[in-house]
């Protein structure tokens, strides 16, 4: 069974100017529902999602490892421009663009992920939390408007306490929203455990249940990257 993702661009309230369909997964269960997208200042559409099969998009060609993630660009007329990949166990949770057309994607990953540019060429490798197969580590990747890889950051959450009765620690850092404005990029996220971004350390919060069981409290943060 093939899974399809569809996009519609509107110039007016009820009139679609173009539509596009991407076939990126073999099954519906591998398809990312509610995948983030954005529109840049020139009217180009930046879309994201998951892929579990080879994807040909304009001159880009992406091959997956596990359930990989992609970011792709359509121009304002709906023509395919390029697609870049996060090859490995990865999910894009947020996307934004700045005034120059640069594109920022943030999300979660596990193990080893290869960052591919808009030609499908590997440009960098990121490593998640060691020994953890769940997507608890986070990435932020910057691409140029032409799909060139510019830079990346990795956030690896760490267990902050190990009290008796703590149970199985489960630190994580989950991006929710990216905003690029006035030359800066802001990230909204939730986290458990300690996470370090540049020189900023986000400290985990904990509560005790009847004084016997200590557990992580999910905490929200907005940080400037």
Can you name each region flagged by the protein language model?
Residues 11-225:
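A sequence-level/structural motif corresponding to short, flexible coil/turn segments enriched
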Residues 1-6:
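Bacterial N-terminal signal peptides
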């Amino acid at each position: 069974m093939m899974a399809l993702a569809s996009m519609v661009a509107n110039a007016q309230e009820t009139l679609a100017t173009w539509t596009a369909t991407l076939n990126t997964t073999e099954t519906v269960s591998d398809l990312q529902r509610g995948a983030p997208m954005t529109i840049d200042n020139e009217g180009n559409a930046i879309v994201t999602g998951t892929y579990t099969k080879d994807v040909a998009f304009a001159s880009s060609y992406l091959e997956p490892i596990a359930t990989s993630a992609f970011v792709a660009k359509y121009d304002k007329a709906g023509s395919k421009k390029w697609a870049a990949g996060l090859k490995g166990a990865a999910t894009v949770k947020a996307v934004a663009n700045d005034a120059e057309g640069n594109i920022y994607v943030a999300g979660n990953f596990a193990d080893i992920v290869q960052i591919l540019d808009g030609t499908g060429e590997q440009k960098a490798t990121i490593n998640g939390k060691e020994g953890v197969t769940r997507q608890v580590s986070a990435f932020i990747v910057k691409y140029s408007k032409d799909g060139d890889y510019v830079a990346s950051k990795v956030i690896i959450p760490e267990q902050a306490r190990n009290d008796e009765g703590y149970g199985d620690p489960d630190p994580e850092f989950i991006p929710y929203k990216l905003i690029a404005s006035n030359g800066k990029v802001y990230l909204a996220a939730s986290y458990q455990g300690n996470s370090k971004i540049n020189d900023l350390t986000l400290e985990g919060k904990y509560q005790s249940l009847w004084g016997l069981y200590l557990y992580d409290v999910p905490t929200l943060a907005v940080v400037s990257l």
